[in-house]
């Protein structure tokens, strides 16, 4: 356990940020799953609309420091590639 006042504050901040990051990551994973399910179901329109929402969430996670910006770019690129392959 932290002994200094500043260490106590940092420990409290870390738990708050950990919960926030966990919710962002959960939301991100769920949206990626939705895109993949739409691609597997061969529904082009649904996949495209979900992809736009997912890109927004991925960019927000990257800007807030939840995931690295290169990771965000890679995820967006791979998802877009899947959807475009489906669209033909």
From Swiss-Prot:
One matching Pfam family: Ribosomal_S20p
Biased composition (Basic residues): 1-12
Full protein name: Small ribosomal subunit protein bS20
Role played: Binds directly to 16S ribosomal RNA.
PANTHER family (alphabetical): 30S RIBOSOMAL PROTEIN S20 (PTHR33398), SMALL RIBOSOMAL SUBUNIT PROTEIN BS20C (PTHR33398:SF1)
Stretch list, region Disordered: 1-23
Similarity comment text for this entry: Belongs to the bacterial ribosomal protein bS20 family.
Record carries keyword Cytoplasm: no
GO cellular component terms attached to this protein's record: cytosol; small ribosomal subunit
GO BP terms, alphabetized: translation
MF GO annotations: small ribosomal subunit rRNA binding; structural constituent of ribosome
Alphabetized UniProt keyword annotations: Ribonucleoprotein, Ribosomal protein, RNA-binding, rRNA-binding
